[in-house]
Amino acid sequence: MSKVAFLGAGSFGTSLGILLGNKGVTVSLWDRDENVINDINVNRKNDKYIKDLTIPTNVTAYKDLDEALNGAEYVVLAVPSHVIRTACKNLKGKINDDVIIINIAKGIEEGTNLRLSQVINQELPNNKVVVLSGPSHAEEVSKGIPTTLVASSECMECAEKVQDLFMDKNFRIYTNDDIIGVEIGGAVKNIIALAAGVCDGIGYGDNSKAALMTRGMAEIARIGIKMGGKAETFFGLTGMGDLIVTCTSMHSRNRRAGILIGQGKTAEEAIKEVGMVVEGIKACKAFYELKEKEGVTMPITDIAYKVLFEGAKAENAVSLLMERDKKKEEI
């Protein structure tokens, strides 16, 4: 049976660790927080991130990275997008070339505007990378609620290995070779979810959200295709599927942050109240720069940028979006 090491014992990393542990896989969870490590190893819980769960005994938490990595055939990057590069640097010289890196973070690197698999490839060029993505809230995965994701890689053999690793009766995995499309969909949908939350916070209705999600889907496809993704990917699980769940669920950090912003809070206040990383805010800045560079029209991203970084009022920004020049509906 395989051994899987997770870098990060947050909500999603812990949930996937539980899933694998219940399948009989040996799992190590590396984290810096000694309270989290103690809670997992002593109490078989991780109450800091997910309440009311029991962690199997074959899941062990470590503060020492070398111990966590010992014997691992797979390493799962379960850390926020802005620390992916640091995490990979920490892996240098500690893992063999045949260890498969599985990334579950969704976002883009601030400053370089690189996709996360590109960052991983820069730091760990000899290791194959698989992106595991799709509509999946940790709160539901940890409870065994049926969930379906995509394992995407340039190495289809590696994607199939990850598919076999995670598949069980309540966790279905498809494979996909469009890693660009999968990563772009997973990153941009967080911007649209922020905007959907703003609509909810202002008090707009279902009509508004349906329009925003649909036109948001067009933005995702537009920038994704421009960057080399396949059109069909954006209408699958990692595009439309992830967009739907992130824009509608109260588990969504991005939607919750958007609601608070729509109610008049600043981005900083919203992040503090949510209490966890809100990837859509970083993604908004990155994709605003990318769409300018690539010459792609992304009006929802434009408006989100004005609210998040230029101090525009949410209601005024929505008016700007609605009062743009008339045009034909198209992707």
From Swiss-Prot:
<feature type="active site" description="Proton acceptor">
    <location>
        <position position="189"/>
    </location>
</feature>
<keyword id="KW-0443">Lipid metabolism</keyword>
<comment type="function">
    <text>Catalyzes the reduction of the glycolytic intermediate dihydroxyacetone phosphate (DHAP) to sn-glycerol 3-phosphate (G3P), the key precursor for phospholipid synthesis.</text>
</comment>
<dbReference type="GO" id="GO:0046167">
    <property type="term" value="P:glycerol-3-phosphate biosynthetic process"/>
</dbReference>
<feature type="binding site">
    <location>
        <position position="138"/>
    </location>
    <ligand>
        <name>NADPH</name>
    </ligand>
</feature>
<keyword id="KW-0963">Cytoplasm</keyword>
<dbReference type="InterPro" id="IPR006168">
    <property type="entry name" value="G3P_DH_NAD-dep"/>
</dbReference>
<feature type="binding site">
    <location>
        <position position="134"/>
    </location>
    <ligand>
        <name>sn-glycerol 3-phosphate</name>
    </ligand>
</feature>
<dbReference type="GO" id="GO:0006650">
    <property type="term" value="P:glycerophospholipid metabolic process"/>
</dbReference>
<dbReference type="InterPro" id="IPR013328">
    <property type="entry name" value="6PGD_dom2"/>
</dbReference>
<dbReference type="GO" id="GO:0005829">
    <property type="term" value="C:cytosol"/>
</dbReference>
<dbReference type="GO" id="GO:0005975">
    <property type="term" value="P:carbohydrate metabolic process"/>
</dbReference>
<feature type="binding site">
    <location>
        <position position="279"/>
    </location>
    <ligand>
        <name>NADPH</name>
    </ligand>
</feature>
<keyword id="KW-0520">NAD</keyword>
<feature type="binding site">
    <location>
        <position position="12"/>
    </location>
    <ligand>
        <name>NADPH</name>
    </ligand>
</feature>
<feature type="binding site">
    <location>
        <position position="242"/>
    </location>
    <ligand>
        <name>sn-glycerol 3-phosphate</name>
    </ligand>
</feature>
<feature type="binding site">
    <location>
        <position position="277"/>
    </location>
    <ligand>
        <name>NADPH</name>
    </ligand>
</feature>
<feature type="binding site">
    <location>
        <position position="106"/>
    </location>
    <ligand>
        <name>NADPH</name>
    </ligand>
</feature>
<dbReference type="Pfam" id="PF07479">
    <property type="entry name" value="NAD_Gly3P_dh_C"/>
</dbReference>
<keyword id="KW-0444">Lipid biosynthesis</keyword>
<dbReference type="Pfam" id="PF01210">
    <property type="entry name" value="NAD_Gly3P_dh_N"/>
</dbReference>
<feature type="binding site">
    <location>
        <position position="11"/>
    </location>
    <ligand>
        <name>NADPH</name>
    </ligand>
</feature>
<comment type="pathway">
    <text>Membrane lipid metabolism; glycerophospholipid metabolism.</text>
</comment>
<protein>
    <recommendedName>
        <fullName>Glycerol-3-phosphate dehydrogenase [NAD(P)+]</fullName>
        <ecNumber>1.1.1.94</ecNumber>
    </recommendedName>
</protein>
<feature type="binding site">
    <location>
        <position position="189"/>
    </location>
    <ligand>
        <name>sn-glycerol 3-phosphate</name>
    </ligand>
</feature>
<keyword id="KW-0560">Oxidoreductase</keyword>
<dbReference type="GO" id="GO:0051287">
    <property type="term" value="F:NAD binding"/>
</dbReference>
<keyword id="KW-0594">Phospholipid biosynthesis</keyword>
<feature type="binding site">
    <location>
        <position position="252"/>
    </location>
    <ligand>
        <name>sn-glycerol 3-phosphate</name>
    </ligand>
</feature>
<dbReference type="InterPro" id="IPR011128">
    <property type="entry name" value="G3P_DH_NAD-dep_N"/>
</dbReference>
<keyword id="KW-1208">Phospholipid metabolism</keyword>
<dbReference type="InterPro" id="IPR008927">
    <property type="entry name" value="6-PGluconate_DH-like_C_sf"/>
</dbReference>
<feature type="binding site">
    <location>
        <position position="32"/>
    </location>
    <ligand>
        <name>NADPH</name>
    </ligand>
</feature>
<dbReference type="InterPro" id="IPR006109">
    <property type="entry name" value="G3P_DH_NAD-dep_C"/>
</dbReference>
<dbReference type="InterPro" id="IPR036291">
    <property type="entry name" value="NAD(P)-bd_dom_sf"/>
</dbReference>
<keyword id="KW-0547">Nucleotide-binding</keyword>
<feature type="binding site">
    <location>
        <position position="254"/>
    </location>
    <ligand>
        <name>sn-glycerol 3-phosphate</name>
    </ligand>
</feature>
<feature type="binding site">
    <location>
        <position position="136"/>
    </location>
    <ligand>
        <name>sn-glycerol 3-phosphate</name>
    </ligand>
</feature>
<feature type="binding site">
    <location>
        <position position="106"/>
    </location>
    <ligand>
        <name>sn-glycerol 3-phosphate</name>
    </ligand>
</feature>
<feature type="binding site">
    <location>
        <position position="253"/>
    </location>
    <ligand>
        <name>sn-glycerol 3-phosphate</name>
    </ligand>
</feature>
<dbReference type="GO" id="GO:0047952">
    <property type="term" value="F:glycerol-3-phosphate dehydrogenase [NAD(P)+] activity"/>
</dbReference>
<feature type="binding site">
    <location>
        <position position="253"/>
    </location>
    <ligand>
        <name>NADPH</name>
    </ligand>
</feature>
